[in-house]
Amino acid sequence: MHLALTTVLLWAWGLQAFEIVEKENIFQRTPCPAFLMFENAAYLADMSFELPCHCKPEEVPAVVWFYQKHLGSSHTKVLTDFDGRVLTEAAQVRVGSDMLTRFSIRMFSLLVFRAQSEDSGLYFCGTRKGDYFYAYDVDIQNSEGMVATFQDKGQEPFADEYYGHLHVFTTFWEWTPCDRCGVRGEQWRIGLCYLQSPDLSPRYLKAVPDVVSCGSRAVPRKLRTKARDHTPEVLVRSCLVPCEKTKTIREGVLAIINYVSKVGSRPWVPQVPIQFHQQRLGHGLIISCPGARPEHAVAWDKDRQHLYRTQYLKGVNRSMRVFIDHGNQLHIRFTQLDDRGIYYCWRQGVLVAGFRLGVTSHGHYPASFSDPETRSAVELTLIGYLLITAVFVTIHFCRCCCYLFHCCPSFSP
C-alpha cells in the first residue's frame, strides 16, 4: 500500500515538474533566426494590436522594444524603460496621443493602442544592448479615405488592379458579429490593401509568397506609388439574430419596483445605465460606446430609431450632420434642439449603455483652448488681424515709394 502511494506521488510530482519545464522552455521551442527577418502585419488606423516577441535567449530576463521608421534609420525610438516595465492602460489612451503614451509591454509582447498611420514602421524585440531577436514590419492603413460597400444595395468591392507583374487587391477580415439582437442589425468586415509582386525585398517574411500589405517596407517606392490609390474598404450587410435571455434587473431595484407597485404605479427602469449630458446649441459632440474598440461590432440608436450604417456611416453623404465614424463613435455636428433624446449603444450584439442628451441655448461656459471651437475662433481672429496689417503696411509702403520717386503726385501728403 505504501509502495503504491509513493509511486502515485512520484508520478504526480513528475508531471508537475514536466509542466514547469515546459513553461520555462517556451522560448527554446522557437529558435531565433540567424538572420533577422521582418514579419509583415497590417492594421486599420485607431485599432489596437499586439506584437509578440516569439523568441529570445533564456538568459535574457526582460526584452526592450525599439522602433524605426525606415530600415537603417539613424533615429531609433526606445519604447520601454530598460527593464521592460512600462505599462499603459487602454482606457487612458486618447486618439492622436503620442506613440510613447500609447503602448504597453506585457509578457514580452508589445501592445499598441489606437495606432495611427505614422506608427507604421519597423518594430524590434531585443535587449538593452541593442541585440535584436525578432522584428515586425507594421503597416497602419489610414481610414480617412475608406470606402464603404453595402451588399444590400447590390454594391461590389473594388476590382483587383494589374500593372504588369504587380497585382493590387483587397484582403477582407472575418465578418463581425451582428451589432444588434432581436431587431434587424448589421455586420461588416474590414478590407485592407495588399499587393503581389516578384520585386519585393527578400528580407521580409510573407504568409503568402510575394504578397505583403501595400504600405510594407518590402515594397519598392515605385510600386507603392501605384498602389497608393487602393484605399481600405468596409463591406456591410444586414443580419438578424435572437437575443439571449438574461436577468438584468438587480435585487435592490426589484425590491423598489415591488414596493412602488404596491402603491399603484410602476416606475420606468432603464434597461442599461444612462448617463446625462447637456450640450450647448450649435456646438459639436462626439459620443463613444463604453468599452468598445474599433474592431468591435458597435451600433447606435436614438430613442426608438435605429441609426444604420447604410445611412449614417461617415462618407455616405458629405453633408451629414450626424454620422458614425470608422472608429464606431457617433458624431453630432452643430447640435440642434431636435437632437435631444436618449442615444443607446450596442456592443457585440448586446445593449450596454445609454446617453441622455439635453440641448440648451443659454448658460455660462468658460472659454478654453482645449475647445476646438474656441481655437478656431482665435485662429480666424488672428488671421483677420494679419490680413488687415498686411494691407495697411502695403498701402503705406506704396505711398512712401511714390512720394520718394515723385511718380505718383496724387498720393503725396
From Swiss-Prot:
Disulfide bond entries: C289-C345
Cytoplasmic side: 398-413
Coiled coil: none
Matches recorded under Pfam families: V-set (PF07686)
PROSITE patterns (alphabetical): IG_LIKE
Record's subcellular location: Membrane
Signal peptide annotation: 1-17
One GO location term (cellular component): membrane
Transmembrane domains' residue ranges: 377-397
Glycosylation sites: N317
UniProt entry keywords in alphabetical sequence: Disulfide bond, Glycoprotein, Immunoglobulin domain, Membrane, Signal, Transmembrane, Transmembrane helix
Ig-like V-type domain: residues covered: 267-361
Extracellular side stretches: 18-376
Membrane topology, as annotated: Single-pass type I membrane protein
PANTHER family: FAM187 (PTHR32178), IG-LIKE V-TYPE DOMAIN-CONTAINING PROTEIN FAM187A (PTHR32178:SF7)
Family: Belongs to the FAM187 family.
The protein's name in its UniProt record: Ig-like V-type domain-containing protein FAM187A
Annotated organism of origin: Homo sapiens (Human)
